Regions:
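Glycine-rich, flexible N-terminal cofactor/catalytic loop recognition
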Residues: 1-62
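Conserved strand-to-helix beginnings and helix N-cap segments that scaffold or border functional pockets
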Residues: 22-23, 68-69, 92-96
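Alpha-helical scaffold segments in soluble metabolic enzymes
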Residues: 45, 70, 120, 124
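Short glycine-cluster motifs
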Residues: 76-126
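Short low-complexity, flexible loop/linker segments enriched in glycine and/or proline
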Residues: 52, 71-73, 126
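Catalytic-core regions built around general acid/base machinery
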Residues: 25-31, 70, 74, 98-105
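Glycine-rich, highly charged phosphate/nucleotide-binding loops
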Residues: 62-71
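Short phosphate-engaging motifs
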Residues: 42-43, 67, 117
């Protein structure tokens, strides 16, 4: 398998049905070195379904600054995915300070888009 470029991969996850994961999200999650997530137990349901085993770092509003310090050595030569419990990370989720840290250090950042509850709601509204 290919190694991903060092950086932060902001990966959207399914918002209801685990099978709504995109092919690109599955590929990125399988190739990153580490995954930062809100709730490891919740994230493991998706990762186990996909057959992906990675070291997980739990991210919450109360531990975000400490987490940034803890992963500082990994940032320099690792690919790290940021995922939320459902949907797009950073939308009502922790991770803003982590993203700002990557921006400040000029480390590669990319987004892997996925399902959108806003679009789904508009579609259902007719």
């Amino acid at each position: 398998m290919n190694k991903l470029k060092t950086g932060l991969y902001i990966v959207s996850t399914p918002i209801g049905n685990l099978e709504d994961i995109t092919l690109r999200a599955k590929k990125v999650l399988s190739l990153v070195d580490y995954i930062v997530c809100e709730n490891p137990n919740h994230s493991l349901k998706l990762l186990n379904k996909l057959g992906i085993k990675k070291k997980l770092f739990a991210l919450h509003d109360y531990n975000e600054k400490k987490l940034i310090k803890n992963i500082e050595n990994y940032q320099k030569n690792s690919s790290i995915a940021l995922i939320s419990d459902a949907g797009s990370p950073l939308i009502s989720d922790p991770g803003f300070n982590l993203l700002q840290d990557y921006i400040k250090k000029n480390i590669f950042i990319t987004v892997v888009p996925g399902p959108s509850s806003v679009i789904a709601g508009l579609q259902l509204a007719g």
